[in-house]
């Protein structure tokens, strides 16, 4: 199931790239009055389908199915469309410069707490709910806010340009592909050694994250970059 998650994700990405040109053109060229009703009907249908399943992993299989992952991609394009609009630019500028330092500090803290809440919900919530719409609103808020605070006043605007975070950002794709497998491996090892003792959960998380970063670095250096260079050379011939 862990490996299936990564392979399904790659399938979703390939499927999206094949239709990106047409999907992007449709969303950018049409008005919100056309886009929002169509997308809303699609989202409601997907949510109803997720909550109608009762068997284990059924909601997960539906979640990974490429046509339903189009919802995430559509939301991303819609967010870009809004960000480029006059209203989006005004809101972005207000977030960056139109609030005081204290307001920025509080807002940054709320965003971090939102991420922590989403993490806890992802672990403990019902799969039908988790696979339906858990990440839609939070992802939109997080992406828009992160882009807007590039020159902001809050502590996140000073933390995000950090060299370590920049370095990790270059491996974000590999980290995403590896994290489920690496965390599961470390979890199985610690369960055998320590049982379900929650006092070791913090150490387990640190080891799992370190293992994920290590595997991401190895795969990018010895697989991703060499493969990319070979394909680039073939394409240039």
State the predicted function of each range:
Residues 2-4:
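A recurrent flexible, glycine/aromatic-enriched loop bordering the glycosyltransferase active site
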Residues 19-20, 186, 227-232:
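Active-site-flanking alpha-helical
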Residues 162, 225-237:
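Membrane-proximal cytoplasmic C-terminal regulatory module of class A 7TM GPCRs
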Residues 73, 103-225:
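Alpha-helical transmembrane segments of multi-pass integral membrane proteins
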Residues 8-26, 41-92, 115, 131-156, ...:
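Specific transmembrane alpha-helix
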Residues 29-37, 92-106, 200-201:
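Membrane-interfacial entry segments at the cytosolic side of transmembrane helices
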Residues 30, 56-62, 95, 126, ...:
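Juxtamembrane loop-transmembrane helix junctions in multi-pass integral membrane proteins
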Residues 34-44, 110-111, 162:
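Central hydrophobic cores of alpha-helical transmembrane segments
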């Amino acid at each position: 199931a862990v490996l299936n998650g990564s392979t399904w994700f790659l399938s979703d990405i390939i499927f999206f790239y094949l239709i990106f040109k047409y999907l992007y053109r449709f969303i950018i060229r049409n008005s919100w009055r056309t886009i929002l009703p169509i997308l809303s009907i699609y989202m409601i249908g997907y949510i109803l389908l997720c909550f109608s399943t009762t068997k284990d992993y059924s909601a997960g299989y539906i979640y990974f199915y490429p046509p339903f992952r189009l919802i995430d991609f559509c939301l991303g394009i819609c967010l870009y469309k809004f960000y480029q609009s006059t209203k989006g630019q005004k809101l972005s500028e207000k977030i960056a410069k139109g609030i005081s330092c204290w307001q920025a500090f509080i807002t940054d803290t709320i965003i971090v707490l939102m991420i922590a809440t989403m993490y806890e919900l992802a672990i403990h919530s019902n799969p039908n709910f988790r696979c339906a719409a858990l990440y839609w609103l939070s992802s939109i808020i997080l992406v828009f806010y992160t882009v807007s605070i590039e020159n902001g006043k809050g502590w996140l605007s000073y933390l995000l340009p950090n060299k370590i975070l920049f370095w990790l950002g270059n491996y974000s794709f590999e980290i995403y592909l590896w994290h489920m497998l690496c965390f599961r491996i470390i979890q199985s090892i610690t369960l055998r050694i320590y049982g379900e003792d929650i006092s070791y959960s913090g150490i387990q998380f640190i080891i799992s994250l370190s293992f994920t970063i290590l595997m991401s670095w190895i795969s990018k250096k010895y697989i991703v970059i060499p493969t990319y260079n070979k394909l680039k050379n073939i394409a240039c011939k």
